[in-house]
Regions:
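Transmembrane helix-loop-helix hairpins at membrane boundaries of multipass inner-membrane proteins
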Residues: 1-2, 14-110, 185, 190-193, ...
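Hydrophobic alpha-helical transmembrane segments of polytopic
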Residues: 3-13, 28-42, 79-86, 108-115, ...
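C-terminal TM-helix exit segments that contain a strictly Trp-centered aromatic cap at the helix terminus
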Residues: 41-51, 173-180, 380, 462
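Hydrophobic transmembrane alpha-helices and their helix-loop junctions in integral membrane proteins
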Residues: 92-100, 106, 116-129, 141-390, ...
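Cytoplasmic juxtamembrane regions at transmembrane-helix boundaries
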Residues: 98-111, 244, 435-444
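Short phosphate-coordinating micro-motif centered on Lys-Gly-acidic
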Residues: 136
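Cytoplasmic/organellar membrane-interface segments at the starts of transmembrane helices
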Residues: 234, 363-365, 418-496, 500-501
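Low-complexity, proline/glycine-enriched hydrophobic segments characteristic of transmembrane helices
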Residues: 464-577
Length: 577
């Protein structure tokens, strides 16, 4: 029920927001805050609950495919924390947007809730087609928010964003359709098994189609052409969501869909690792020369996400917890900085850092909070960013000293551009005179401060994040195992029912034919899937052993039952003679 609520309730909230009056933004904001806090509470409960799954509901069948597409949600540590970022950043966006879009706040809140629902669906979908549906559904509300609430070039930014993301995902849609048509269903294990029956060249082609969609969404160099203008022209609350939550869908895709399904050659692994490091270096260098505050933060985000991609393809044992901590830390710090940059633009009337300056003197509370969040984003010891980046560096060291050294250079560059950013915005003298605009409200300051405190708490005790990877619910795994082989389960149930009623020899033969043990390839793919979804070595070994024993026991029982039935039939036939 909790998983269904987190995916479907935001869309319901968007519909309910339509009933509020456009002329009464206060009532709209109160209702939006109520929904926002409720969704954050649900996401926290989801993290505490551990791995869980809904019942797999048959949705529809793709023409030419053997199996059906399921509405099936599954939560693991990585997905649960991404949902927390989605709901948390959306709540802060609703809070900051209340003071920025007073006259049209209702429409702003409607689009935010629709975007939240699509993001949550992306991070919780266990069916590949369902995942792709939500993956693409994120584009529409985000584009509407950019076009309706963005800056001077908002229409160009919205068009660029939509074209890049939709065109980048088109090859994945074709590849997914082809792969689903070869598989029993569109769940991870079935897709992985179907892929094994294809020749290496086709496997590589399908892999590239999937990779392209995730490379564009993250984005990774050279597929980043949409990012700078989109983040700059989008309203600051949306920019915070784009960088803090929506961009994580790309990295999430690498972990949850690429690694479990596709066999990766070392050439692909090395290529992706160095592409991530190139992105990290490129983003840091572009941030060093940026004068637009939001573009600087966009390139900074690109650099950190490039480091996360490199960490994913280090494929070390510590990869998943390292990348998870880095993603959570980046989501909180980058999101907070975009919110603050939006408040600075509202106050000073510009986001050009050369024309800002002296905000610490003109607005001391804002200046103090801005400096506090900037220091936290530098990944100093004691912060979540430090834990995430240090553990990713250790993961890269497993691939050799050179990748780790390149990543270390990125961290030095990040310190350089962030210190320059702070110096230009809150210290010195402004390059022009301006009348003070709207100041940061107490609610805005409190919500952003909480994000900063969370970075400190998670830095002191990162187990708050990584423990979610160890929480284990057997019922969720049983449900997952049940739907990975739906055809075999249905056939087995049908045959057993027939055996009870007919007792015919050919039915007994069917029992023995259907009740086949899981092959080593099946078990290997299942182990890879469980590992990618955060299960520990002990949990995976225990589950695989149980499934193997259950499978062998069921086969033995089926054959024994068939033999006994055949013997009875022979005896009955001889008596009749």
């Amino acid at each position: 029920m909790l998983l269904h609520l987190l995916v479907l309730a935001p869309f319901a909230a968007a519909i309910l927001m339509m009933a509020t009056s456009k002329e009464d933004p206060k009532s709209s904001s109160r209702l939006a805050f109520l929904f926002g806090f409720a969704f954050v509470a649900m996401s926290i409960a989801l993290i505490a609950a551990g791995n869980q799954a809904t019942e797999a509901i048959e949705w529809f069948q793709i023409p030419g495919a053997k199996g059906s597409v399921y509405y099936y949600l599954y939560s693991h540590g990585l997905g649960a924390w991404m949902v927390f970022l989605s709901t948390g950043l959306s709540l802060v966006a609703l809070i900051t947007g209340c003071n920025t879009f007073e006259k049209n706040y209702r429409n702003f809140a409607i689009a935010i809730f629709a975007l939240m629902g699509a993001m949550n669906g992306t991070f919780l979908a266990a069916d590949a087609v369902l995942f792709f549906f939500f993956f693409e559904a994120m584009v529409f509300p985000a584009a509407v928010l950019i076009a309706g609430f963005g800056g001077a070039d908002r229409k160009k930014a919205a068009m660029t964003f939509a074209i890049y993301t939709l065109v980048g995902s088109a090859p994945m849609m074709v590849a997914l359709w082809y792969l689903v048509s070869m598989a029993d269903n569109s769940l991870v294990l079935s897709l992985a098994v179907a892929l094994q029956n294809l020749d290496p060249s086709m496997q590589t082609t399908l892999l590239l189609c999937f990779l392209l969609a995730f490379l564009v969404k993250t984005p990774v160099f050279p597929f980043h052409g949409w990012q700078a203008i989109t983040y700059a022209e989008a309203p600051a609350p949306l920019s915070a969501i784009l960088t803090g939550a929506m961009s994580k869908a790309g990295v999430f895709g690498f972990i949850a869909w690429i690694l479990p399904i596709f066999p990766l050659s070392m050439k692909v692994v090395d290529g992706m690792l160095w592409l991530g490091l190139l992105t990290a270096i490129y983003g840091a260098l572009m941030a060093l020369r940026a004068t637009d505050g939001k573009k600087l933060l966009a390139f900074s985000s690109m650099s950190h996400l490039g480091l996360a991609v490199a960490g994913v393809f280090s494929l070390s044992e510590s990869m998943l917890p390292a990348v998870l901590v880095l993603l959570v830390a980046h989501g909180l710090s980058a999101g907070a900085q975009f919110y603050l940059m939006g408040i600075a633009e509202r106050f000073a009337g510009t986001r050009n850092i050369e024309q800002l300056g002296g905000l610490a003197a003109r607005n001391p509370v804002f200046g103090s909070l801005f400096g506090f969040v900037a220091v936290l984003s530098l990944a100093v010891p004691g912060t979540a960013g430090f834990v995430g980046e240090f553990t990713v560096l250790m993961s890269l060291w497993d691939m050799g000293p050179l990748p780790a050294l390149v990543a270390g250079l990125c961290l030095i560059l990040s310190a350089a551009y962030m210190l320059r950013f702070v110096q230009k915005v809150i210290f010195g003298k402004p390059a022009r005179e301006y009348v003070d605009g709207k100041r940061m409200t107490a609610l805005e300051g409190s919500s952003i401060s909480i994000m900063g405190v969370m970075l400190l708490v998670f830095g002191m005790h990162p187990a708050f994040i990584t423990n979610a990877l160890q929480l284990f619910d057997e019922s969720a795994v049983q449900e997952m195992n049940k739907v990975t082989h739906p055809a075999a389960v249905q056939e087995s149930q049908t045959v057993e029912a027939s055996a009870d009623t007919t007792g015919e020899a050919e039915v007994d033969e069917n029992i023995a034919a259907v009740a086949q043990p899981m092959t080593e390839d099946d078990l290997r793919q299942l182990d890879s899937n469980l590992k990618a979804n955060g299960f520990s070595d002990e949990e995976r070994a225990s589950l695989i052993a149980q499934l193997k024993a259950m499978s062998e026991s069921e086969v033995a029982d089926a054959h024994e039952e068939a033999a006994e039935s055949n013997e009875a039939n022979v005896k009955e036939a001889s008596e009749n003679e």
